[in-house]
Amino acid sequence: MAKDTTGRMRVTVKSAGRMKLSSKLWLERQLNDPYVAQAKRDGYRSRAAYKLLEIDDKYHFLKSGLAVADLGAAPGGWSQIAAKRVGAPDGRGKVIAIDLLEMGEIPGVTFAQLDFLDDAAPDRLREMLGGGADVVMSDMAANTTGHRKTDQLRIVGLVESAAQFASEVLKPGGTFVAKVFQSGADATLMTQLKRDFATVKHVKPAASRKDSSERYVLAMGFRGVPIVAPETVDE
């Protein structure tokens, strides 16, 4: 155990057996991350809970009685925060969550193990919501290939799909918040969001690691712009 540049004690992991360097570095980062330790003390399932806490503490979009759709919810940190703030455990609000992975029960949260990109997922989510949503939030991240351009396209595609779903289910005045990377949401998506929402910005909460390119796009004040299908011309 040694001290880091801030004077705090730092845990180092000795390689054992066939542990890969990447696994060793990941474990060291987890052991030395103050948000990981705080999440355990506070009973949150992941450090990601503090990202949503910080964003909502500043922008106040999670309010009592609202309906929330949480895309890519597992292990459940964001759902825990949303459920508490909208009053889902006592029936004042509602949180609907989906993920490819299993997720343990959270009081007030209705969960379905679904691939959001599956054609049937949006309709299933609408059915679970039983009406419109006040907040659509996505902490989804695409599986990486190691090829930067391919990974960026996958990330953009995932965020665009989440934004499209948000535009279909959000009530007027609603909020969309989603994880993006590198330079943030691309120009096409930003144009769409600025058309459909009163306020659009990028935010990077303190709980997001400094060495990470992770950011969040926050769009508030949904205008309720209807989606118009392309016109067909009869010949």
UniProtKB/Swiss-Prot annotation:
Catalyzed reactions per annotation: uridine(2552) in 23S rRNA + S-adenosyl-L-methionine = 2'-O-methyluridine(2552) in 23S rRNA + S-adenosyl-L-homocysteine + H(+)
Record keywords, A-Z: Cytoplasm, Methyltransferase, rRNA processing, S-adenosyl-L-methionine, Transferase
Active-site residues annotated for this sequence: 179 (proton acceptor)
UniProt superkingdom: Bacteria
Binding site for S-adenosyl-L-methionine: 76, 78, 99, 115, 139
Entry GO CC: cytoplasm
Main location: cytoplasm
EC number(s) recorded for this UniProt protein: 2.1.1.166
One annotated GO molecular function: rRNA (uridine-2'-O-)-methyltransferase activity
Location(s) in or outside the cell: Cytoplasm
InterPro entries from the UniProt entry: RNA_methyltr_RlmE (IPR050082), RNA_MeTrfase_FtsJ_dom (IPR002877), rRNA-MeTfrase_E (IPR015507), SAM-dependent_MTases_sf (IPR029063)
Cross-referenced HAMAP family: RNA_methyltr_E
Family: Belongs to the class I-like SAM-binding methyltransferase superfamily. RNA methyltransferase RlmE family.
Known function: Specifically methylates the uridine in position 2552 of 23S rRNA at the 2'-O position of the ribose in the fully assembled 50S ribosomal subunit.
Name of the protein in question: Ribosomal RNA large subunit methyltransferase E
Species annotation: Rhodopseudomonas palustris (strain BisB5)
Gene of this entry: rlmE
